[in-house]
Design a protein with these regions (language model features):
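A boundary/linker detector
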Residues: 1-23, 31-35, 72-104
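Short microdomains enriched in Cys/His and/or Lys/Arg
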Residues: 45-62, 80-94
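Histidine-centered nuclease catalytic patch
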Residues: 27-57, 66, 70
Length: 104
């Protein structure tokens, strides 16, 4: 059975993972340990797209901390600044799946 368009849009392709890994030097952007490029800035559950501008390299511990603890706000603020530095014109609203391409 084919995947829904939304589901495909939220997945992180191997090409995106490779680009993000290179962008982040293979290290967790929070603590500097070796990491994997599989963390969504805007979560998949919130329709966050699997695009470079929404993906971060994090180690396992920091990924869990970002997803499941009260540190999320502090981490999110840092990640937002980090992504803005990497992508001039970075816009959080462009990171969310929008079936109808309607401006929010």
């Amino acid at each position: 059975m084919a995947k829904a368009k939304r589901t495909k849009s939220l997945e992180i392709s191997q090409l995106v993972k490779k680009k993000v890994y290179e962008r982040d030097g293979g290290c967790c952007v929070w603590c500097g340990k070796p990491g994997k490029p599989n963390a969504h800035f805007i979560a998949r559950s919130q329709s966050g797209l699997g695009i470079e501008e929404n993906i971060l390299t994090l180690c396992w511990d920091c990924h869990m901390r970002y997803d499941q603890t009260t540190n999320r706000r502090k981490m999110r603020d840092y990640f937002k600044s980090y992504l803005k530095l990497k992508y001039p014109g970075w816009d959080e609203e462009k990171l969310v799946y929008n079936k109808w391409n309607v401006e929010r």
